[in-house]
Amino acid sequence: MEIELNRFTPAEQATFRLRALYEQAGYRKYRASRFEEYALYQEYQRFLPDAQVITFTDLDGKLRAIKPDVTLSIAKTAQPAAGECKRFYYNEEVCRPSRESHTFQTIHQMGLESMGAVDADEQAAVVRLALQSLAALNVPTVLEISHMGYLTGLLDALHVPAEARAKLLDFLRAKNAHELRTAALAAGLDESAAAALTGLLDLHGPLGATLTAARAACRCETQRAALEELQALQNALGEAGRGIRLDLSMADEMEYYNGLVFTGYVAGIPCAVLKGGRYDYLMQRFTPGANAIGFAIYLDELERLAAPLPPVQQQSREKSWLNIALPKGRLGDKAYKLLAGAGYSATEDYNDTRKLVVENPDACVRYFLVKPSDVAIYVEHGAADIGIVGKDILTESGADVYELLDTGMGKCRMCVAGPAGFTDDESRALRVATKFVNIARDHYERRGRDIDIVKLNGSIELAPILGLSDVIVDIVETGTTLKENDLTVIEEFMPISARFIANKASYKFKYAQLTELLNKMKEALAK
């Protein structure tokens, strides 16, 4: 009896197709235990996506954990002999904390691992399977690759201090050129070295052309070796690898991956659905001399493909539109005027309508007018492709987006303020009133200061006046409100302005449209 796959959800269809694909390629199914001894995750914590796991004391008295990862379990038990390559695939659920809900959630993964004697041919075979896995989803996809050796080689060649690397890598991941350069100079690098780091952001595009550009930017043998490996991969894949894109600014999970890394995106899904790469360091902790490569597909994300298109998109399916989230208020007005001046005006003035969505069919742009604090959420979740948002809101939300431009609009600063003459009594916790809880906590953690946070949503200046707090953490533009209430700025610690942000998947699928708009916006700002 034939199974009609269209009766199943996208994730269920993918499971059938991928199982057949992996078994045909010689992979054996691995069945993981639901629980592992907590000691495993404690010892290899730096290889986990998050240090938080659910633990419990089992009936035998041992401390166990609900598994947050499958690869660790496979690596522990695989034990390939010298010269042997073991191949496994899995279809499992893992349990990890959610940044948004602040609760644990189950994540359905399907993936494969190749462990042991992993040579160039084996590596190419795994990447080919990643391409075939994406193709099995029957929707437009993109596979991006990179090599950790190119990035670490550059950091070493530039003598980047170890204590500065984490911050620089954060800016690289966000494609945040303006703050990457500033941080590089602050770390003691000269202009040439800072330019080399920001130049990584330009090394993305079709595999062949980007390899050529990357060779010209090489500074050490480690980088050249990484590019030779990527060239060998391109040669091995041949026609199958034509659609692969290279992005040498990828800096995800550098504690885990040590060589080739790759990420897969699906049209209509706002985040990566496939992640993988080489993780030799982890494998060698269990089996000395062994190497490993693998990837996982996040099946839960595929369920989005079954959802109907939003009403605003159902009438424009034949064209690719840019969906832009603008904040209501003065900043949104400034941003709209700038975009309108660059040729992206709407057919109707959004200030003269009660509509929340206005369009320009000729320019294929659509504006959403949203609460300022929600802009980053709309962009991160793919409801908008791009948006304009204040750095304060972007930092507080921790949204996983690309930060492509500092527009310079809406300049102000994040400050600690309090009554004139305030003296901090370090013998007790400092009471801090703010609506920027994460920013305040991070600021004082860096200083090693114990604080109690009072979260408020408005009229923050009232808190120290009424004795609710000792100080406040808030944005300050002119300082007039502070002065009128006998408060003064104690410390300025973060400059704020409006940032141009993009959804990561939209950046892959709408790159030409997005960069054209971005470049026109830069030209308008320069006038």
Task: For every predicted segment, state its role.
Residues 7-25, 36-37, 71-82, 89-140, ...:
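Positively charged, Gly/Ser-enriched RNA/tRNA-binding surfaces
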Residues 317-527:
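Domain-level signature for soluble enzymes in the chorismate/prephenate branch of the shikimate pathway
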Residues 52-101, 375, 380-389:
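Glycine-rich, N-terminal phosphate-binding loop and its surrounding beta-alpha-beta segment
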Residues 1-67, 124, 128:
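TRNA-binding/sensing appendages of the translation machinery
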Residues 32-51, 146-156, 250-259, 461-466:
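Beta-rich nucleic-acid/ligand-interaction surfaces
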Residues 60-62, 114-120, 506:
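A generic structural motif
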Residues 151-242, 477, 488, 510-527:
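Long, charged alpha-helical interface segments
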Residues 62-64, 138-142, 269-271, 288-293, ...:
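Short active-site oxyanion
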